[in-house]
Amino acid sequence: MTEIVSRMSPIGPHLHYPDGDASLFWRNVRSSGEYAADLAEIKAEGERLRGQAPTGLTFSLFSQFAETGSRLEYERAYFERRRRLNTFALLSLLEPECEEHYTELLEAIWAICGEVAWCLPAHVSPERPLGETIDLFAAETGFTLTELRLLLDDRLPELLKTHIAGMVHARLFEPFLKKGPYEWEEAEHNWSAVCAGSIGSAALLLLDKDQDRELLGRILEKTQHSMTCYLKGFGEDGACLEGLGYWNYGFGYFVYYADLLYKRSGGELNWFAQEKVEAIAGFQQKCFLGGDAVVNFSDTLPYASVHIGLSRYISSIYDSVPSPPSRLRADYREDHCSRWAPALRNLLWREMAGNAPDWEPGDFLLEDAGWLISRTVSPKGVFGFAAKGGHNDEPHNHNDLGQFMLAGDGEFFLSDLGCGEYTKDYFGSARYTYDCNGSQGHSVPIINGCLQAEGSDRGASVLEQANGASESRMTVELSRAYDSQELQSFTRSWLWRKEELPSLELRDKFSFSKIPDTLVERFVTLIQPEKPSGQGRLLLVRGNFALELVYDDRQLQSEVTERTYRDHFGKDQVWYTLDFHVLQPQEQLELRFIFRFIS
């Protein structure tokens, strides 16, 4: 690493801009219709925020998490400060002649430099002083300020540039090298990529003098190790078990760092040459089930947009990764955490690949993850099906072996609740009492009163995975997920028929050592079911389609229950359980359901 660092190119505009011409780039952004929606969103935020004092980060707000377990109050104020910073930074780059933007920007930078800590209360530990705490957002903040220091360069007062550099050294570089190791340094999930990637990126953007080379080399050696650990969290199939949202987050910061590293090292350090990185890059397009509906196993939102910059950047590198449709571009205001790195690169990297009208149909077997995904396109519309095996100790784990979802024309008919409101208990011992996390909130059975248990030993065995032109199928063995002593085996089979209006056949086979007292099949939806005339049918109606659920009412008694849960944004959301009670449990039992789209 020492020799490579000694040969690194100087820091300059070539790290961000085509041909190194900043003024030409921003003139093009102002004049090109490609960016019109982005500019309107950024300017609207500027008008909303202009003249407002930065939101206060008081001790009482900071203490609320420790006292009540609630995160939202402090984080709303914290992220609003980042929104101010991002907005007036972008406006200052877009309209450098406007002194009002610049004045607001300086105040935003000064406010963030004045924060007692850049970390969130939820990530503070009594074992480590605040000044040494590096979490996701402390690392991101240092990366952001360092990048702004470079992009604005001589427009910033020298005092402020020196202050930013000093704070990044004190809050990131020195603790990273002298106060570790940090738990996230060898994490096999998004934390290693975001924390180490942000620190490594800040170093690549700040350390340029001869006397900085040794320090830069030490930081990069540790960062490279963390990136290796991050990639270990993926199988060769490239699936992100944390879900698409955390793919955008963790893999995004991996790419932001890898890009700067590649450019400063003149291509000598090239993460993009690894086959696994290419496989991970292809994960996003596999997740879309039609419209903005996405596979949302784990702590993931059910509907998603794309970071258009990140997506087009990786598409420009890999022929195997299609460019996303422009209509899925994330609105500038969408990111409630107001992250600078993707906001900037959604502009910087916009034109690195072209637009696509829509995702192509596709069937994807993710063998390491134990997922089957099918995106089916017919004259009637776009339909999606996804099912999973896996195990119950995945990152941001849900107890959900055998979970599946169905979507039609961008709407979910059978759902995964995804991520709930993040609180202290949500990541504590009470995690699986939350319906969105425990198996009670998933389309899996309750066996003899038992829900699924958590743990890496609670794993599914994939017995069959196959894709064909007209159908896709998967069979998994799931008995290890349950603590029911009488349960000897439980296999779940899905058969997805890719017709003009697709259908799914579900077969569950149970074997018990003695007859169970109860057995309940459960399916989860956000749609209030209708029970049409005739027996053995339920209808879920949304938009132009309905999903007809057909079952044997001689074998099963249906029960519909309306429930609520707190979503990721702290709002109560209604959902429904469709329970089917087995009327006469047996030692050997097979249950069959048909889910058929109708128009």
Model-assigned labels for residue ranges:
Residues 35, 75-287:
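Aromatic-lined, polymer-binding surfaces characteristic
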Residues 136-138, 369-371, 401-403, 412, ...:
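Extracellular structured ligand-interaction cores
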Residues 414-419:
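Catalytic Cys-His active-site segments of thiol-dependent hydrolases/isopeptidases
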Residues 81, 134, 192, 247-250, ...:
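Active-site-proximal structural scaffolding
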Residues 326-333, 422-599:
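CBM-like, beta-strand-rich accessory domains located in the C-terminal region of large
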Residues 61-68:
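An N-terminal structural lobe/cap that precedes and organizes the functional/catalytic core
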Residues 1-41, 54, 77-79, 90-94:
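Extreme N-terminal leader/anchor segments
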Residues 251-413, 585:
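Carbohydrate-active enzyme catalytic cores, enriched for enzymes
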